Regions:
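A structured binding-face within diverse protein domains that lines the active/interaction site
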Residues: 1-142
Length: 142
């Protein structure tokens, strides 16, 4: 599924930030919010597919490509989502793009353009959909 989607069904997943959880000692994890220092939205490299759902309905699914972490993200997790620089988005979406060239786009985004900060554990529940989920509880890491 992923190989075909990588070749033929690439997309951008637009966001203004994302969460990642840092493992602590034991089973606890600390949530972090990561965003561009500029605060502007960005595009993740994504792939999509249509699957047959129940009763012959079609179910659209997508996944965000990941890569090894940059210096900032390595402090939090062992991988990170692929954030495409603005000048490479069209190339990612180009149906004629060469597969090896596309693989070359799956690299860590520059650390110096990102910030990460600890947020409340409110984010751990999907029932909590408020600005409190992205408010810093500690100063930003950069």
């Amino acid at each position: 599924m992923f190989r075909d989607a990588f070749r033929r069904h690439r997309c951008l997943v637009v966001a203004d930030g994302f969460y990642e959880w840092k493992k602590n000692h034991g089973r606890s994890r600390t949530p972090f919010f990561i965003r561009l220092k500029s605060g502007r939205p960005f595009g993740f490299a994504g792939i999509w597919s249509l699957k047959r759902g129940e009763k012959a309905t079609r179910l659209a699914t997508c996944a965000i490509a990941t890569c090894s972490p940059n210096e900032l993200m390595a402090k939090i997790h062992n991988r990170m989502p692929v954030i495409l620089p603005a000048d490479l988005r069209d190339r990612w979406l180009d149906p004629a793009a060469d597969e090896s060239e596309l693989r070359g786009l799956l690299v860590p985004f520059p650390s110096q353009e990102l910030e990460a900060y600890e947020v409340s554990k409110l984010v751990n529940s999907p029932r909590n959909d408020s600005p409190d989920c992205v408010r810093p509880v500690m100063a930003a890491m950069d």
